[in-house]
Amino acid sequence: MNKKKYFSKIYDQFVDKIYRFIFLRVNSEEIAKDLTSETFTKVWHAFQNSEIKNLKAFLYKTARNLTTDFYREKAKISHASLENLPPIVDPKRNPQEKVIFEERMERIRKGLNNLREDYRQAIILRYIDGFSIKEISEIMERSPGAIRVLIHRALESLKRECNKKEDFSSS
């Protein structure tokens, strides 16, 4: 199989995943589409000119770097919202269980939005995108041990965020 056909298969396999990865960071469909396109363009050029050992990790690393560059250029920091993710609903649940489940999911979304960026990124890569520790270490450019610690701390922080009681009293 030639490089063009192989890369076309890689594109088809990862375009939606890379888009979601970027969208969760920029919270804009238009910007996410542009950065996704730019990611695949850069990876294609690198793919033509050199051997890439782990193409999946290289794709995510490139997407992460382009997202970081985007925020540097705009000189603003925006926390990506997870509220636009489609709800996860089990049709077998009764209405009361569905309400409780949705409330929990909303707490998790809010908790994730309140985490620092590297914690949020580690949790998303591990539990939403399904990456291994090794793959996350390549994407985030840290050792596997550091990633394990980061994920542990991120989960502890997320647990604290989700357990916070919302204050509805007026200040």
Question: Where do the PLM segments sit?
Answer:
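A short, charge-rich alpha-helical start-of-domain segment used by transcription regulators
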Residues: 1-20
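Hydrophobic-face residues of short alpha-helical interaction/recognition segments
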Residues: 18, 22, 59, 63-71
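Short, Lys/Arg-enriched C-terminal cap helix and immediately downstream tail that follows
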Residues: 22, 72, 115, 155-171
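Structural recognition of an alpha-helix C-terminal capping motif at a helix-to-coil junction
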Residues: 34-41, 45, 53-65
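Arg/Lys-rich amphipathic alpha helix in sigma70-family domain 2
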Residues: 64-82, 101
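Acidic, proline/glycine-rich intrinsically disordered inter-domain spacer in sigma factors
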Residues: 85-113
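A short pre-motif secondary-structure segment
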Residues: 122-126
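DNA-recognition helix of helix-turn-helix
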Residues: 138-164
